[in-house]
Structures are given as C-alpha cells and as structure tokens.
UniProtKB/Swiss-Prot annotation:
It catalyses: a 2'-deoxycytidine in single-stranded DNA + H2O + H(+) = a 2'-deoxyuridine in single-stranded DNA + NH4(+). This is Single-stranded DNA cytosine deaminase. It is linked to Immunodeficiency with hyper-IgM 2: A rare immunodeficiency syndrome characterized by normal or elevated serum IgM levels with absence of IgG, IgA, and IgE. It results in a profound susceptibility to bacterial infections. Changing residue 20 to K: Impaired nuclear import. No effect on CTNNBL1 binding. The gene is AICDA. Belongs to the cytidine and deoxycytidylate deaminase family. It is an enzyme of class 3 (hydrolase). Interacts with CTNNBL1; the interaction is important for the immunoglobulin switch activity of AICDA. Interacts (via its NLS) with KPNA1. Interacts with PKA/PRKACA and PRKAR1A/PKR1. Interacts with TRIM28 and NCL. Interacts with SUPT6H. Interacts with RNF126. Directly interacts with MCM3AP; this interaction may favor AICDA recruitment to immunoglobulin variable region genes, hence promoting somatic hypermutations. The modification Phosphothreonine is found at residue 27.
Length: 198
C-alpha cells in the first residue's frame, strides 16, 4: 500500500481520460470499502493502490481484502475508481471472487477503457463483470471531483476539469454501453419471453 493520498500531478496524469493515453502503463485504483447495515453504511477503509512487481492492481486489491475477516452475515460495498478498466484475466478473477463472496458488491468507475491489442478479449471481460453483478461506469466530472477531494493530496486546491473531460466521458460511456448492450438486449428478451410464458 502506498501513502494514503495520491500526489496531485500523478492523479491528473494517470486518470486523465484522454483519447490517446501514451505512456500510461500502470493502473491506479482508488477504493472505498463500506459495510452496509440496513439503511446506513459505515466506511471501513479507503485508499489507493497501483500495479506492483508485475501484479495487476485488481489482484492486489483482492489479496488485500481477502486478508480481512469479512463477516459473511453482513453486506459490504466496494467502490473502485480506476485509471484503466480491468483486463480480461483480472475481470475473470474479480468475477470469481465476487461469486465466492456474495455479501460483497462492487462498483467500478473507470477513466479509460483498456483494450489489449493482440487479444481483444477485454470487452468480454467487462461483460463477465457485468454478469457477476458489477456496476461499471465511466468516470464523469462528479467522480473526478470526489476522487480529488478524497484520495488526492490537493493542498486545498479546487479540482478543475481539463479540456475534453466531458466529451471524452460521453464518448467512453457510449463505447462501454455498446460493449454491455448485448447483455441488456438478452435480459430484455428473457423478460419478454417470461411475460409471454415461453
């Protein structure tokens, strides 16, 4: 685990949702873990991680939370803000982990979509996460503002959007929607068949 708060310049560089993210070879993951008790929730931990020694950050987080003694009788909500969406292998590990821990839910807000040039399996990884109940969305100004005030050593500076933040968020949201769209259509068809008694 690194220091509790991320350096301001590092956050702006790593999380910037630019179309061509040249040189950004690491994934950063800011997280919040909450325990839900009926209508209220309690923050248990927050911080950030990054890839280390060739190990992807998603797997580092799974190792980290596996060391906790999570009460199977309580519900936990984990929220990630990531600089890149998970690769196919990490998505598979996360989905398997969630299946083994049904009392834990995960939301992922990502700055950019990761696509490995040689495999093109990453969209299927995102669909697999979605099927496992993970809520996946692209970061918007509101999410960047929250991260800036929660995870960044900002020295009381106000978060300022860079040129193109909104447009890139919209573009990436549409792309993510197209990736997940087949799932929505299949769910709609299943509901229609059930309604018709087929």
């Amino acid at each position: 685990m690194d220091s509790l708060l991320m350096n301001r310049r590092k956050f702006l560089y790593q999380f910037k949702n630019v179309r061509w993210a040249k040189g950004r070879r690491e994934t950063y993951l800011c997280y919040v873990v909450k325990r839900r008790d009926s209508a209220t929730s309690f923050s248990l931990d927050f911080g950030y991680l990054r890839n280390k020694n060739g190990c992807h950050v998603e797997l580092l987080f799974l190792r980290y939370i596996s060391d906790w003694d999570l009460d199977p009788g309580r519900c936990y909500r984990v929220t990630w803000f990531t600089s890149w969406s998970p690769c196919y292998d990490c998505a598979r590990h996360v989905a398997d982990f969630l299946r083994g821990n049904p009392n834990l839910s995960l939301r992922i807000f990502t700055a950019r979509l990761y696509f490995c040039e040689d495999r093109k399996a990453e969209p299927e990884g995102l669909r697999r996460l979605h099927r496992a109940g993970v809520q996946i969305a692209i970061m918007t100004f509101k999410d960047y503002f929250y991260c800036w005030n929660t995870f960044v050593e900002n020295h009381e500076r106000t978060f300022k959007a860079w040129e193109g933040l909104h447009e890139n968020s919209v573009r990436l949201s549409r792309q993510l929607r197209r990736i997940l769209l087949p799932l929505y259509e299949v769910d709609d068809l299943r509901d229609a068949f059930r309604t018709l008694g087929l």
